């Protein structure tokens, strides 16, 4: 069980958090730390790219929801990039498609932040 986390600044006044691997009870703290660090630095518009994520459990979903809640307190938002049908299904079943912007590509997710 591993997770790769890469954070980069985007040209749309947003930060992109690229994740790869599995987001579960063991790897979620690393994801939470990356998101928390951005928020603590005053970055409230985030794109979390899940294209390379193979698996996410309830702990991982909780980290994403927690991040969204924190950025919304500052007028920001979190958009997700998700192309894996199994991961998309989890967001659909849990109803999280109603609270997250979920996009098929990073460009669309970043563009939606700007509007």
Predicted segment positions?
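Extracellular glycan-recognition surfaces and repeat-rich motifs
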Residues: 1
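STAS-typified acidic loop motif
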Residues: 4-33
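Conserved catalytic submotifs in the C-terminal HATPase_c
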Residues: 11-12, 51, 107
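Amphipathic alpha-helical interaction surfaces in cytosolic regulatory modules
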Residues: 23-100
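Acidic phosphotransfer microenvironment of two-component signaling modules
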Residues: 85, 107-108
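Short acidic-hydrophobic, aromatic-tinged amphipathic segments that line or gate anion-handling sites
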Residues: 101-105
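A short, charged, amphipathic alpha-helix used as a generic interaction element across diverse proteins
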Residues: 109, 113-115
């Amino acid at each position: 069980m591993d997770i790769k986390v890469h954070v980069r600044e985007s040209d749309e006044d947003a930060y992109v958090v690229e994740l790869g691997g599995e987001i579960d009870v063991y790897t979620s703290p690393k994801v939470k730390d990356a998101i928390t660090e951005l928020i603590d630095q005053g970055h409230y518009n985030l794109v979390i790219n899940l294209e390379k994520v193979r698996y996410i459990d309830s702990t991982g979903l909780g980290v994403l929801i927690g991040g969204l809640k924190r950025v919304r307190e500052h007028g920001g938002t979190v958009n997700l990039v998700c192309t894996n049908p199994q991961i998309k299904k989890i967001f659909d079943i849990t109803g999280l498609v109603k609270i997250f912007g979920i996009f098929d590509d990073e460009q669309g997710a970043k563009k939606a932040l700007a509007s």
